[in-house]
Swiss-Prot record:
SUPFAM superfamilies: Winged helix' DNA-binding domain. Disulfide bonds: none annotated. It comes from Photobacterium profundum (strain SS9). The keyword Repressor applies. Keywords: 2Fe-2S, DNA-binding, Iron, Iron-sulfur, Metal-binding, Repressor, Transcription, Transcription regulation. HAMAP family: HTH_type_NsrR. GO terms for biological process: negative regulation of DNA-templated transcription. GO terms for molecular function: 2 iron, 2 sulfur cluster binding; DNA-binding transcription factor activity; double-stranded DNA binding; iron ion binding. Residues 28-51 bind DNA. This is HTH-type transcriptional repressor NsrR.
Amino acid sequence: MQLTSFTDYGLRALIYLATLPEGELTSISKVTEVYGVSRNHMVKIINKLGQLGYVDTVRGKNGGIRLGMPANRIILGDVVRATEPLQIVNCSEDFCHITPACQLKGILASARSAFLAELDKHTLLSLIDNNPPLLVLLDRPVTE
């Protein structure tokens, strides 16, 4: 299963925000610079993550973005469910005439469930905790 770029960069943005000291603000421009993604695309992603409560957006001259909740409360499976269209194939009878007898849709549904179940085992914190190489790649201070 391949995630859309929206979900992919949404997760990456959350990873970056999780590396900031608690409460510290950064800019969308900084996140786009780190990942080399279009600012317009990242604005849409941050807007959605803000609506979902994962990102806190602060307006004004001294504004910016930061995590909207602690990283240990952000479950990866929840983020993917909220940002990813999870229909793997179109099994409507109007689209596929074998749908009434097809066993593939059940197998794919099980695979999707297993994929999400694995993501549910991990939080945003688990991606950054004790991961100095990640901090180096994100140009964040490494704490011993």
